Structures are given as C-alpha cells and as structure tokens.
C-alpha cells in the first residue's frame, strides 16, 4: 500500500445513518446504508478543505444567545462546510449554544432548542430535553425532526454537503433531499465554550479503502502524484515497477508574446465644418420661431469643429439680455477643440436678434449654451420677449451648443495616437495557454537559450520555427541583453511514468528535460518527496544487484535515490555459451563517402489508335477485322488503365513526399533549400593585429620570413631589444639565420663595432666578429627563403595542373552518367519506334501494304493474306501492352522505393546499414532527373578494422543453483574478449566498455533449440500416376493447326540503367583531387616597426605650436573669448578678456556707432 501522506486521519466516525472520514485537509462522506466490499473503491463524496477560520462568540455582550432564532453566519458559496465545536462539545443552553444552520439557496436547514412559552418564533416551544432539526423554504417549515438530548448530549458538529443537500449533526445524517445545491451561507449562534471552526470545502473525487463497510484510508483525486496514480489505476496498492499515466489538469495560467514592444493606435477624427448661411431670413417674433441650420450631432469618438468662417464675425460678450449666454460652458468656440470631454454634443447655427436671442434660447431649452456674433446685419429681427415681439432688432449669428458631461466624446485638433506598451512575461516549466506572435495554443515552455544561442537560429529577424503541423516549436524573444530562445513542448508527455519502489511512489520518468531532472538512459528522472517534486540529486554509490526497481543500469531505491548497477565479474562461468567463439572485424575508423543513386519514378504513357494501326484506311480490312470482336478494346483498356494507374500513383507519390512547409534558412547569402546546415557552420574568429597607436606612430616594413622569426621577435621584444639581435639568432636546418631587416639602431650599433675594430689593427680586430656573424646569418636567411619560394612555386604549379586534370575527368564522368539517365527517356521512344516499324513487316503475307494485296488477289485470297497481317500486328500491339504493363509494375516498385528513400534518407537519418548509400547514413540530398530522382548520399564507411574475438554469450553455473545463460540485449552490441577480459561493444563501431546489468538478457538454459525444416512434396493433381506431360502436349500440338509469324524479325529491348563505372570514375577523381592538396613549406611574414627620425618629431612639435598660436590670435581679434579664457591660459588673451568687449551695430540711418556693455560671466 502506498504510504499515507501527512495530515491524515484525525477523526473517524461510522454511525447508524451515515459516516464521515474527517481530516484537517479533507472530509469524506458516504452513506452508511451503502456498504461496499472490502478494498479500494472510486466514489464521489470527498471534499477538500480550501479555507479554515474560527469564531469565539457572536452573541455580543448579552448574558446569552436567543434560542429558537437564526442569527449570525457567513456567506460561503461552497460545495460543503463543516462547523465543529471543541471536542468536549457545547451544552444545549442559551449560555453556550443556541442555533446552527445552513442555507441551500432557497432552503434553510437548522438545529435549535427552545423551552420557553411564547419565546420560540420559528419552531414553537419544544419539550424539555429535546432538540429540533427543521427545514424551511420561503419562511415555511416543511420538515421537523425532534430528537432527545440523550442521543446528542452536546453539540459537536454541524456539517452541510451539496450532494442531495445532506446535513450531518454530530456525524449523523439528519436531513437529505433529492436536490443537489451548493451551500450559500451557514453559521453557528452561540455565546461561550468556543471557538467554532469553519471548514469551507470543494468537491473532489476520492479513492476510499473499505474494511467491513468502513473507510479506513482515502486518496483524493486532486492532481497530486499519489492521487493521479491511485485514481487512474483504481487502487492504492502498487508493486514495484513503472506505471504510465496521463495528467489533464486544468490550465490556469496564460501569457502573450507580442511581436512589437509598443503599438501605436491612431483613432479616426470626425470633422464638422460650418459655414455662413447667406440665404437665411430674419426670424419672426418669439424665440421658438428662430430657425436652425447645419445641425451636427456627435455620436462617440473624436471630433473637430471647424468655425473658420467666424473670423469675419465679431463676438458679443454677455451683457444682461444682450449678446452671448453660456454660463454652463466654460469654453469659447475658438477653444472647443482643446480636448474637451462630453457624453453628448450637438452644435447648430441660427440667425436671430442679438437682443435676448441667446439668453431666451437657453431659458427655453433650445440649447445648453448660446454664442452670439455680429456681422453688421439689418434691423429686421423680431424680439423674443413678450413686450418686444413687434420690435425690430439687429440680426446676428447665434451658435447653439447642446451638451452633457461624460467621456464618450472628445474634441481634438489632430487624430489622437495612443501608444500601448507590451511586456512579455513568459511562464516557464508549467502547462499554459499561450498566444505567441498571434498563434494560440497550449504547451509547456522551457528556456533553451544556452543550447541554441551558439547556432544563430533565427538570426535574420525570424520570430519562430514551426513544426510539420504548423505549430510553434521554437520562438525567440528580444530582451534587454539579447535574444532568448524558448521551446514549446506538449503539456502531456506520452512517455511519462510513475516509479514505485519498495511500495512507495518515489519519482517520475519522463522524456521532457524539466528543471531538477537527471538523465537515466534515454529518460529524465524527477524525484518525489512528500508528494511533491524536488530538485536534482546526484547519483549515489554503485551496487552489484538491485532488489528494487531498475531502469537500464540504474537502480531506483525506496527513498528515491539512484545507484548504478555494476555486477561482479562472472567468475562462475564454465565456457562461452555453446562453446562458440569467432574472430570478427569491427570498424574503428571511417571515411566520408558520397554515393549517387538514380531511381525512375515515372514512365512515358502511350496512346495508339488500334484500328488505324491494324488496317489503316482500308475498308476491306476493317470489315474483316470485325470478326475479331472487341480485341482492340480489350488491348487499349489495358494500356489506358496502365496510364491511369500511373497518373494516380504519381500524384500520390508527389503529395506524400512533398514537405508540409519549406523552411529555407539564409546563412550568409547561401541557400541550402530544405536542409538546415547551420549546425555545421562556425563563426569566423576576428584576426589579430597591431594597435592603432603603433600603426600611427611607426612605419612598418613587411618581408617574407622563416618559421624561426616568431621566436626571434619574442626574444628581441622590449625597449632595448635591438642590443640582443645577435644573441636571439636562431638555427634553421643547421644554419644560423637572422631576419634581413636592420633598423637604424642596429645599423648604428654594428657600424660602431666595425669602426672600433679597425682603430688599432690586430689588437681590436676581434670587434668585427659580431658584424661579420650577423651579416652571414642574414645572407643565410635570404638564401633559404629564396629556395623555399622556388619549391613552393613548383608544388603549386604541379598540384594545380593535377587538380585541373582531375576536374576535367570528373566533369566528363558526370556527363556520361547524366547521358545514361537520358538514355532511359530516349529508349522509351525507341520501343514505340520499333512498334511502328512492325507495320513494314508482312508476317508471312505477300506484302505489308494492305491496298496492294487487294489489288493483286481476289477477295478470298486477299482476306487470307490480310488476316496474317492483322494477326501479326495484333501480336505486336500485345507485346507493346505487355511491355507497358511490365514497365508500370517495375516503375511502381521504384516509386515505392523512392518514397522509402525520401522518408528515411532525406527527411530523417536511416538506421539501416547501406540502405541510404554505402555505409552508415549521414545526409541525403535529392535532385530532379529525367523521369526520376537522383539521390546524393553522404555516408561514412569503415576504413580500418579491429580483429576481436566475439562470444555469443556466457553459460553461468552457480554453486547452489541451476545453470543459466546470459546474452546481449538486442541493439546493445556483442560480447568480446580483449586480453582475457570480457567487454561489450557496438557491432558497427569499436567502443568496448564494461558489461552492466542493462546490457544482458538472462536465459533459463545454456542449451539451444535447433529447428529443422522438412522437405515437403506437393502431390500431383492427376490421379493417374502414368501421366506424361510431354506426351499430352505433343498430342495437342499435332491436332492443332498453327502458323506463327517470324518473331526473329521483331526486336524488343528493355533498357537497363548502369552508371556504376561512372560513379567509380567520379570516386577516383575525388581521390585524385584529395591527392592534389598542396603541402607547402611554412613561411611567415616578418613585420618590423621603424621609429621616425628626430627631425620628424621636431617638425610635428613646431606645427603644433604654430597651430595653437594661430588659434589664439583668431580668438583675440574676434573678441570671442567666451569659454576660451579659462581653457587656453594665454596671458595676452586673458588680459584682453578682462576688459569690456565692444561690438558694432548699424542703425537704420546708417550711422555706425560704438556701444559698450558689461561683460557677462559664464
């Protein structure tokens, strides 16, 4: 049985009507009437605790609570709630407990007690020492249960469950119905002896273990590892092993990856333009008779109101009854477009009296605000007040604005632009709903930047790599520190398995590399501690055998730790299994080989008019041919069916081999089609060179050097390195050499040495030895360098000529191979040509021309002759049809082979030896060819082999047990013997290693089962044993009249494609090109830096001083001292800047005057 988790059972009640299984983390309810058999059972009724709270007293400061009433409580909206008192319980008294209730939507169930006459408003007075459980709906009681206090001496718990609205008092079921409704509110009304603990719960499925009808253990199906395992297998008892599982848990997290960091949204700006109504008439008397024009009403959005025509009008301020009137509008029409907000807005213009026109329009409700403008209008507008209706006033322009406050409408002068900033918060290592660059899906996101950044994936502004289904496989996000790569994995791993060791759930095996996992063989292991995942733990010590569960060479212990299984050497084996040992060759080094393979995938179709082919235009022949029946139709149906099958299979072939999408990478302007070879490309390293300062201050001289020159340069490095010139000389092939370049310091040194040696004759002659030695060493350097240059020149010329010759051979051989491919197409036409040539054969007739036969002979004789032509030509067509059928079968088989080659060689890497080329497959590139495909296979083939002793297996004879045999696991390799030790190695590559438990399969016996195949003879179908086939055939042949055409004159050839010789020729050319590699003698470039002479430095100093003086003089003469006074520090300039500067100003009267102003400090 799996280990029971912490915080398990704290209370277990199995009473008369119901039972509950209660813990601090969940409560399990089940009907006592339902007694399942012993064992594990999957049921509903489990409720996991989601919230726990407590309450000490809700009766306030009064002496007690009021019995018989419902008071207090809290809103829960949950599947279940449990309200429990302390273990001692509460007395049925107003000083301790009064009422507990649960509200199921419109139904309320409660328990209370009330012994006071007239003081029990809900239940009425009860008998002494009794309690009441009631249910009430819409204020009316419809269920009453009176129970003696003797059964429930104290109140301990009141629990309500949504399943059939079940209510439990002290663990007993006291109310239920046929409805299932969540609990909306609940509470306990009490005074003392608290606290009351409230447990709010949600419903989950559970697996319960029953003994004699009572739940002894419960496992929640809550998504935990233990719950997933137990509820999927309907048991809590597991033996050691691996258990596949699925986890379809609810995805709660979402995230979005935006393509842009920010998005600008430009809104539409609606423009309303108003103009002057030139044809408007003066208004009649009364404000209601003022006519409006150009009414514009804004709906929602952004608006611009254009009142440009008002520039010729004069705004009239509000002056009691005269002019404008807009106290509710804090803006003018000139500022209405300054980003004002409205809930509704309507604008119109009118023409009315300036005297009272605006004010009365606002008072009468025609507008919220009114703006008056004068344009010098006539005195023709009637008044709007009761005493002025017949008076004439000056007409003016009135602008009505009707508005209400809000945010639906905003005014603007330009289309508004709102910038939305997007932030990518990517959720890792959990199943999420994602929206990545507009593609929506669900997946498990992992960060693969460390493994992908070095290969420059998506370097050319790409966003994502899609898989064959079109879903995102890898995507990239630009961050502050560069590109981050993420991989989208499926949420559900079909290979995930729980690991049970020692009866305990200890870990998970999955194919997904999650954080904290460790690699075991081809899977990743995640340890589980206390029901949760934990981080990676290193593999502990090795063991000789594993009494628990093992995976390959790893042993998984009950504590979740991992040990490596290293079995002891088999000291008890008597002999190799079956006493069979043999020497085998196993390759240990390989060469890259390129193999060309041509496969024909289509055939040329043919259509022949059978009747025209047989008889031509002869009517006599056509009449005679009618006696042959539908032979032409049958033959043509065969040819046509071959063509139709060819078309159908060809379409299926190309549709099945065409990839779902073309991901063409661009790698430095190199197109590789569908094949991504970015993993093979490396980033070129930046060349090393001298610093910019050295190249600027020194003149460099380059000369051809020897390999010893680098050591010379390192030896002479430093400020006084020239003094060690002769000391740093090197030898090359026994000769002393020095670089031929001599600097000025060296020249001075050696010249002084030579002059000093000649000063006193023989006494100082030895001083010339350094001069002579260095001169001879430099002459040796020049001679050796010239000889190496000549040798390298000869090698380059010879290798180049050899390479040109091999390239010519290669082009010639490739041309021949392609010519043979083209011959396949040409020979298809040759078959048709041969068929047409059969028209010239007479097939035993007097002529091959039907018209000529009918001219020379009478009708009966001519028909007999033409009958021979018809029979011969039908035979020729039959051969053509048979040839096409045979060709279709062969091409169909070739297409199947091509499909396998594309799927296994092009789209993947084949594991079959020599199926994709010769040797182990690496890469295949397909190319189009006439009527087929050419595959270019890149493989590696063995170059050298190791001769080892191979062993089938071992026969082991333990001391106190029966013998058994061990053999290698299929696919792991073979057992070999090396220096009296035994190892296992792969069959196709020599890699010997120690034998582990995961490499062997145990057989029950050391004996082999031999199977022999008996020879079985099928009896003849003729009962007579004296049946002679030759005799029967001769009888049939003699009795049959026959006359066959001369088939020797008919020649039919099936073309066979053979480019083996040309491929071998290409391989010889490749070897020749490899042999033409040039191995040059190593030369080096000697770069010597020579310092400039002293007079150059003196000229640079003079030029710098002159430049500074000229710059100071310019500042001095122009008066632009500004910031220069404190920068240059020139004394005359400082004294000049200390005075007041002057400037000249030219006035309109062309009088030039001089003005002075104080100096401004900077």
From Swiss-Prot:
Residues 822-866, 1055-1083 form a coiled coil. Residues 769-874 are annotated as: Heptad repeat 1 (HR1). Specific enzymatic cleavages in vivo yield mature proteins. The precursor is processed into S1 and S2 by host cell furin or furin-like protease to yield the mature S1 and S2 proteins. The cleavage site between S1 and S2 requires the optimal sequence [KR]-X-[KR]-R. Additionally, a second cleavage leads to the release of a fusion peptide after viral attachment to host cell receptor. Residues 1117-1162 are cytoplasmic. CDD domains: gammaCoV_Spike_SD1-2_S1-S2_S2. Glycans are attached at residues 51, 77, 103, 144, 163, 178, 212, 237, 247, 264, 271, 276, 306, 425, 447, 513, 530, 579, 591, 669, 676, 714, 947, 960, 979, 1014, 1051, 1058, 1074. GO terms for biological process: endocytosis involved in viral entry into host cell; fusion of virus membrane with host endosome membrane; fusion of virus membrane with host plasma membrane; receptor-mediated virion attachment to host cell. InterPro entries: CoV_S1_C (IPR043607), S2_sf_CoV (IPR043473), Spike_S2_CoV (IPR002552), Spike_S2_CoV_C (IPR043614), Spike_S2_CoV_HR1 (IPR044873), Spike_S2_CoV_HR2 (IPR044874). Residues 1024-1105 are annotated as: Heptad repeat 2 (HR2). Residues 19-1095 are extracellular. It comes from the Viruses. It holds the Pfam family CoV_S2_C. PROSITE patterns: COV_S2_HR1, COV_S2_HR2. Homotrimer; each monomer consists of a S1 and a S2 subunit. The resulting peplomers protrude from the virus surface as spikes. This is Spike glycoprotein.
